[in-house]
Amino acid sequence: MTLKEQSSTIDRLSKENFDLKMRIHFLNEALNRRSEEGIKEMISENVELKSDKLKLQKDNQGLKRKIRDLEKQLKDQQSDKESMLNHDPEGGSDEEDRDHAQDEELLFLRERVETYELEIERLRSESIARESEKRRLAEMLKSLNDGRPTGSDSGAREERDMWKDMLDAETAAREQADEENKRLREELMRVRSEATYAIAPAAPLRSGHRNRGDSLVSHSAVSDRELYRNTAAGSSSSSTLVMEFELLKQENAELRREVSAQTSMLTSRNREKERLYQEIEELKLGQRRDRSIAGDSILDRSASRAQGRPSSSISDRTGQSPIDDAEREDWELRNGQLRDQVSALKLENQAIRQELEELDKAYSADVEQAEEDIQTLQQERDQAMQVAEERDAAFQELRAEAQEELDALGDELDQKIEECQRLTEDLRTQDDNLRALQAEMRSASEGIIRLEEDAQNNLQRYKAVQQELEQCNEEMESLEKSLYEANSKVQRLTVQIESSQNEIAFLREEQDGDKIKIGDLESELKTYRMSLQSEKDKTKELEGRLAEERYQREVVGSKEKQEVQRIMNELNREVSAAKEECRKLKKNLSAQEIETNTWKERLTDLENNLRETLGDLTGSRSSLIANIMKLQKELESTALELESTRSTLDEKETLLRNRDALLESHGLESRKLSELLERERQARRADKQSFEQALKSHHQASRTITQNNSRILELENARNQDRKRFTSLEQQFREQLNERNSMLLTIWKRLSGMCGPDWAHSNSLINGNLPSQEVIGNILFWPGFSRNLLLAVKTLENVISSFKTRVKDVERNLTKQYQTLEHAFSLRIKKLDRLEETTMNMRAQLQTRNQTGLSPELSKLRGENRLLKAELNLLQNHPRSRSTTAGVAGSPQSSTIDLAERGSLVRANTAAESPARSSIPQPAQMTNLAEPTGAVTRPRQFKPSDNHGNQEVWIKRLHELERRLKAEREARLLDRNGARRRLEERDAENKRLRAQLDRQRLRQGVSTETSTDDGGHGPPSEPTTGDEGYREREEEHSSSEGEGITVDIEV
């Protein structure tokens, strides 16, 4: 290859490398976008863009409204100004200044509207560009999937299924995110509307000047945001991310402010509700006090009447008590319902606060994750820049090395051309060498095919080993899972044992408590019986009092008639006062009803607002109704229970009365004895039952304790066995890890040795550390080590993939050189034939001269003398051509030259033709050419003087030619022996190269397997330094071969 071809191939390869880098970059971006983090980022970006769009639309609408209001104000001010100018021309200057300021503000607002419209268009174009980029990436993935070989259909199907699943998951996640975003936006809008509704009544309309100031402030804030965004769009990707993060922080702060305002409003409303509840409870307490006063006993009334007290208005009001009680019960029910509603609203408020706190936490976590992602992206960008700079430096070094190698190859070519000139005389041996070389080429091609087959077999073996490794990893994972499950089971069993122990203690405590309760119940029974006896005594006393009071009423009846009229008057006065008090109470009740209605409306508004905030417009009311129904059911159940208890109490009372009647018939002594007997029997029965229950519980506890102890022993044994297994598994796993690390280290050493010392020196460091078992075993250094391994494998792939091209180039060069050698071989065979013919003719002439005499020889010599004179004249006329092309006159094309002269000049001609073909003149050859010409010219000058001397000269020349022929034959024999020796050396070198090829094929199998595991089925990403190193070694080897390789080229 020439320098131009090599430079063109280098440029082509660099372009292909750049294209592959770009494709890898875009594919990595697509994969990152299709990952979970990328999906989250896209969702967050989508949410941000939509929220920004909504904000911009709202701002745009607000600005349009403000522009309309300002235009209206302008028109009004212009009309006012005209009227003022008509009435007061001096105040026109102030109005003009105001108009100028308002015009500037209008221009500013219009500019802001235009910028907002441009921002909306830019966001739309960005969304369209993102969609087109997604489509382009999808088409690229489809093309890549279509461009893969048919052998990897199963892998392609798996990848397609994986991409489909990822797409479905992404769409589902995006739909969920959109739904959540819509829900959150609706809730935010509702909360904002509630806040505006709550704030709107308290905030009257301000003047136009204040509106103008507020608009300027808001537009300044919006302009600041847009300036942030414009600067972010102009800067790099990292700055854009930082600015977006700052914008997110600002929006987060605004949202927190809104949430704090809403929470403050809610707290104020809750305080108002609590105040209302307190007022309602106070009203209830007052009503209950009134009821307690109205429910005085009959004895108090009779006592008051007997003592001559004036009857109270409350006693006369007892006739209206049923209606008041019903109304009060209704009010109490209403108050209970309101209280339940308020409690439900409190619970809903608490749930909303919890959701807000959770959302705040999630948002802060997302912000932190975004910061971490930004930092990781910046680090990856810096690493990529460093790698790119290192690769550029390596490429420049490789280019310089290639240039130096090309210069060295040029020098070596010159040396080889000289060696080829020395080997031109070995023509017959080259036929055999040609055949041997052809056979060796065939055997080499067969060996290469065999090596390729071996490489494929090694690839299959490597795949099998990789599958076995994966199976081992899966088994390790399953063992780890079983270990985790066993640990969880052990923990569960320990918890169960503790719970069983707690239950045993609890049962013992319950047994002790039951005994205490039995004693308490017995004491309560005694107290109930004593109370019954006392009540009976009280009833007897009351009957006596009633008889006495009746007697006193009959006695005092005559005296009371006189006082009745006075009492009636007083009662009428009290009734009128009571009526006035009732009216006042009704007014108060009506006012309270109005207040309760207002509060009911507020409560309904609050319920509706809370339902809107929660998004459940129907659920809260039904839940409230369900709670009320539950309470009603509980009330009914409690009422039924009360009725049942009352019935049981009545039954008991009847039983007690019957027993009392029976006991009165018997005597006190029999009654006492029977009671004592029954008590003793009951006590004995209770003791027996308690003793039996205690025995049963004791036996059950002992059984459970023994069972638990046995279970504990079994679990401890199983736990010890599991620990032993886990320790053995951990040891095996560590041994396997050590073996793996040692194997990876040996693989790395061999791969780096194959890639060359320069490559190993530039790529051996892993975060500043040399590769070792400890470094490989560390999780932090594993990505760097795996990256270096993949780089080494890729370099070997590039080296092995370039073998075919090199072999083809060598074959082409060999065919070209073989053709040139065949041509030169044919020409030199012809020249040798001519030389043989000339020598045979010379011998025949010598024999004829000896036989026939000197007369024809003299005539021939004279003719030759004439020809030599003519040649001398020509040489004198053309000295330059004689000095450069002295051997042209002796070429076989001139038919008039004598055979003897041709024989004398044939060696010079054969020596002069080789440099003429090689197009590189040599000084030694020029001197060799000059010498025979001088040898020819000298005898020509002495020809006319002495024929006998000329004849002796010709004889000497013939002897010299014979001697030269013998020397040439001996040189040919020596050259043949040297060529054979060189061929043997070349055979040994070929064997060594075949061994290297075998090793490289094996390593290529390992590297292709790792590349397939890595997912890279396409072409190699970039030409690495390992390929160049191998080329250097190969070229050095070819230069060190010397003459053996020149023989190959000749063939």
Swiss-Prot record:
<feature type="coiled-coil region">
    <location>
        <begin position="325"/>
        <end position="743"/>
    </location>
</feature>
<dbReference type="GO" id="GO:0005737">
    <property type="term" value="C:cytoplasm"/>
</dbReference>
<dbReference type="Pfam" id="PF07989">
    <property type="entry name" value="Cnn_1N"/>
</dbReference>
<keyword id="KW-0963">Cytoplasm</keyword>
<feature type="compositionally biased region" description="Basic and acidic residues">
    <location>
        <begin position="58"/>
        <end position="90"/>
    </location>
</feature>
<feature type="region of interest" description="Disordered">
    <location>
        <begin position="984"/>
        <end position="1051"/>
    </location>
</feature>
<feature type="coiled-coil region">
    <location>
        <begin position="787"/>
        <end position="878"/>
    </location>
</feature>
<feature type="compositionally biased region" description="Basic and acidic residues">
    <location>
        <begin position="984"/>
        <end position="1001"/>
    </location>
</feature>
<feature type="coiled-coil region">
    <location>
        <begin position="10"/>
        <end position="200"/>
    </location>
</feature>
<comment type="function">
    <text>Involved in regulation of nuclear migration. May be involved in regulating nuclear positioning.</text>
</comment>
<feature type="region of interest" description="Disordered">
    <location>
        <begin position="141"/>
        <end position="160"/>
    </location>
</feature>
<feature type="compositionally biased region" description="Polar residues">
    <location>
        <begin position="877"/>
        <end position="897"/>
    </location>
</feature>
<dbReference type="Pfam" id="PF12808">
    <property type="entry name" value="Mto2_bdg"/>
</dbReference>
<keyword id="KW-0175">Coiled coil</keyword>
<dbReference type="GO" id="GO:0005815">
    <property type="term" value="C:microtubule organizing center"/>
</dbReference>
<feature type="compositionally biased region" description="Basic and acidic residues">
    <location>
        <begin position="1028"/>
        <end position="1040"/>
    </location>
</feature>
<feature type="region of interest" description="Disordered">
    <location>
        <begin position="294"/>
        <end position="329"/>
    </location>
</feature>
<feature type="compositionally biased region" description="Polar residues">
    <location>
        <begin position="916"/>
        <end position="928"/>
    </location>
</feature>
<feature type="region of interest" description="Disordered">
    <location>
        <begin position="909"/>
        <end position="928"/>
    </location>
</feature>
<feature type="compositionally biased region" description="Basic and acidic residues">
    <location>
        <begin position="294"/>
        <end position="303"/>
    </location>
</feature>
<feature type="region of interest" description="Disordered">
    <location>
        <begin position="877"/>
        <end position="902"/>
    </location>
</feature>
<feature type="coiled-coil region">
    <location>
        <begin position="950"/>
        <end position="1004"/>
    </location>
</feature>
<feature type="coiled-coil region">
    <location>
        <begin position="239"/>
        <end position="285"/>
    </location>
</feature>
<dbReference type="InterPro" id="IPR024545">
    <property type="entry name" value="Mto1-like_Mto2p-bd"/>
</dbReference>
<protein>
    <recommendedName>
        <fullName>Anucleate primary sterigmata protein B</fullName>
    </recommendedName>
</protein>
<feature type="region of interest" description="Disordered">
    <location>
        <begin position="58"/>
        <end position="100"/>
    </location>
</feature>
<dbReference type="InterPro" id="IPR012943">
    <property type="entry name" value="Cnn_1N"/>
</dbReference>
<feature type="compositionally biased region" description="Polar residues">
    <location>
        <begin position="309"/>
        <end position="321"/>
    </location>
</feature>
